[in-house]
Amino acid sequence: MARVTVEDAVDKVGNRFDLVLVASRRARQIATGGKDPLVDVENDKPTVIALREIEAGLITTDIMNTSDRAQQIQQDTAELDAVAAIVGGQQEELS
């Protein structure tokens, strides 16, 4: 198992605070099964996998922000569709 140095990952992201944010968001995606790892898992924990992805340049702040925005839009659309269905059903009952 190759070791991940935080310094290499910090160089890819910009500063250690952003690294913590990006790595934790990515690790959560991997841990919950929402996204597949982009590197070999090698029996590593999600946080180590996330750091390895960042170090390899496969995950950046921009990629995570775009992913989060797309996920939020998808969730908003689903919620609006559900509200429209409820409102549509109530209007039919009143008629």
Swiss-Prot record:
GO terms for biological process: DNA-templated transcription. SUPFAM superfamilies: RPB6/omega subunit-like. Disulfide bonds: none annotated. One of its GO terms (molecular function) is DNA-directed RNA polymerase activity. InterPro entries: DNA-dir_RNA_pol_omega, Pol_omega/Rpo6/RPB6, RPB6/omega-like_sf. Its EC number is 2.7.7.6. It catalyses: RNA(n) + a ribonucleoside 5'-triphosphate = RNA(n+1) + diphosphate. Keywords: DNA-directed RNA polymerase, Nucleotidyltransferase, Transcription, Transferase. Signal peptide: none annotated. Gene3D superfamilies: 3.90.940.10. One of its GO terms (cellular component) is DNA-directed RNA polymerase complex. Belongs to the RNA polymerase subunit omega family. Promotes RNA polymerase assembly. Latches the N- and C-terminal regions of the beta' subunit thereby facilitating its interaction with the beta and alpha subunits. The RNAP catalytic core consists of 2 alpha, 1 beta, 1 beta' and 1 omega subunit. When a sigma factor is associated with the core the holoenzyme is formed, which can initiate transcription. This is DNA-directed RNA polymerase subunit omega. It comes from Colwellia psychrerythraea (strain 34H / ATCC BAA-681) (Vibrio psychroerythus). The lineage of its organism: Bacteria, Pseudomonadati, Pseudomonadota, Gammaproteobacteria, Alteromonadales. The gene is rpoZ.
